[in-house]
Amino acid sequence: MTRFSGRPHGSVTAIPSKSAAHRYMICAALAQGRSVIRGLPGELPDDLTATLDCIRALGAAAVFRDDTLEITGINARPDVLRLDCRDSGATYRLLYPVAPLIGGRAEFMQSPSLAARPMEPVTELLKSKGVAAEKLSVSGSFGPGEFPIRGDVSSQYISGLLLALSLLEGESRIRLTTPLQSKSYVELTRASLSAFGGESQWMGQDTILVKPRRLKAADVTVEGDYTHASLFLAAGAVYGPVTVTGLDPGSIQGDRAMLSILDRMGARVDMGGGSVTVSPGRLRGIDVDVSDTPDLAPAIALAALAAEGSTVVKNGGRLRFKECDRISAIATELKRLGADIDEAPDGFTIRGGGKLHGAACRCHNDHRIAMLLIMTAGLCGGIELNGAECVSKSAPGFFGEYRQLGGSIS
């Protein structure tokens, strides 16, 4: 059991975007020649380590020095690929449709929590194309054509198809059978492919045309991560000014929306010189649709605890299929602290401004839940957590960042 206390304030540097890094690493593995990916953390988070191990298993060569990763595109094509995705949903979903185009048969290993997350839309689609597709194995190639798939379960399905279809000899179309949620992650995949010579374009609201392009080596730099920064920015609104440096103000990351959410809630948001500073204001509850930004739910919850009135987080049903059921976990653990929170099928409502108290809480083996609870410590006089080390999934340096902002760990 680890105790956390303190009211975070000060300055911290954004960690590199995990979402962008996954995509760059896979594009580099699929490209001809030697690519360079700059701006990575000195210690890779668990999820990126999973992707690195998997692209090596696919036949790419990779050398990691300091903050730079050099990747030489896939040469050998093993008959059987064994890909250990650990607990990384991005690794699994991005590589699943790619793997059968690389080797004869791909076998996937994964954590129990990842195994519980849905994959049927992709396996059923590939089966319809003649591929032997099961949740933990896939074999058999497929050709270009039309690929209908739901857009409201996981945007990673669409991103994986974009990567795979770029390798085919002819044009393909991804047709969304339901409205796309988390579109910004699909756009991030399209931008990553473009950096390596790939080409795709929207045809109306529900179809993406993917053109056959031989990916070429590139030299790219990973930008700062708005998802990870969101909790620090929310802490600035709650406790005292927090500055996050290294964030691109023109980023296409969807979680950049945290800035406008905090502004709507009444916090002061200042941008300039590659940094963002958030300072407290008279926070008020608002309604937030997280259909495109579900990973912001923990940061919104933190700000909502200190806001007057009700904050409603809605259209986040996919939060129930993350590393844990995040809606249930947020409601359960914040109630332990005395929060006035109601759980809904697709979100939650927090009536803020009430007095909280310390407690022993569970992290549910979910890095986002652990970080949320740690950042609430200043509102409740301290908190004790079991399993807080799960933050290494996305941010192995998180404890250091927390201490840098004045937090105490014992």
Q: PLM features: residue spans?
A:
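Short, structured segments at the rim of ligand-binding sites
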Residues: M1-S410
